[in-house]
Amino acid sequence: MPKKAGATSKGKNQTKEPETPPPPTGPVATDSKGFVTIAIHAKPGSKQNAVTDLNTEAVGVAIAAPPSEGEANAELCRYLSKVLDLRKSDVVLDKGGKSREKVVKLLASTTPEEVLEKLRTEAEKK
């Protein structure tokens, strides 16, 4: 049976919720609680601390500490706090304590754009 002109359908399409924008792609994002998080690819055992590369998946960070007994994790948080001009207590390892792929959470009030800009500046220094 053909539809009448001007008739509205009572399907699921009528009650469409407003679309939420997709989460930002990139290494720096905001979690559900509003904290800024950074995806890190750690490279422990380097000669000096440095941001080596910034790509869409993670920030490559060379760490001048051995990957034993959490030394590299502590040095990573220390180095990132210096680069981002934050207190050491505001930079916390969230995930990846025994992995090279880590997530660092920033407890200070900052935006992902500011963090990305500071990381880019540090990466260009090498």
From Swiss-Prot:
GO CC term (a single one): cytoplasm
HAMAP family membership: UPF0235
The family this protein is said to belong to: Belongs to the UPF0235 family.
Modified-residue entries (Phosphoserine), positions: 89
Keyword Phosphoprotein: yes
Membrane-crossing residue ranges in chain numbering: none
InterPro entries, per the entry: DUF167, YggU-like_sf
Protein name: UPF0235 protein C15orf40 homolog
Region (Disordered): 1-33
Annotated source species: Rattus norvegicus (Rat)
Pfam family name, one: DUF167
Assigned keywords, A-Z: Phosphoprotein
